[in-house]
């Protein structure tokens, strides 16, 4: 009986993941060599680009993604958002190159995610648990997003 219930549940889950209205093949252009219009309202290609791989910036084909998430930034004690750097390639270099190759690309900063140090985890906890500190963090996130010409934020807590 349990196996039958599990099978029924799994079948329903799989069927619910597919709706006839969102068929990606609706975006096929028979005259296009790539066949699928990546910039339709239906198809999304999201790439995560970790800061420690910024040295590969010149090898990335940004024209093949619709959304780029820069991973991972975190706040320091005063709420300032910091993206670590490991080489000479900056966030501005990545954003500028991505936008020069793909004017439709949406670029987001991914916050938290990955393996947080205990210090960074404590900073997040402090801001999230304290209703008076939370607005400071939000202001710093908005400031970082605007200063770096980003389109939004991906929170990966």
Model-derived segments and spans:
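Positively charged n-region of N-terminal signal peptides that target proteins for export
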Residues: 1-4
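Sec-dependent N-terminal signal peptides
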Residues: 6-9
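C-terminal motif of bacterial Sec signal peptides marking the signal peptidase cleavage site
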Residues: 15-16
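Short, conserved catalytic or interaction motifs in soluble domains
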Residues: 19
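Glycan-recognition patch characteristic of GH18 chitinases/ENGases
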Residues: 27-145
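Active-site groove signature of glycoside hydrolases
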Residues: 140-157
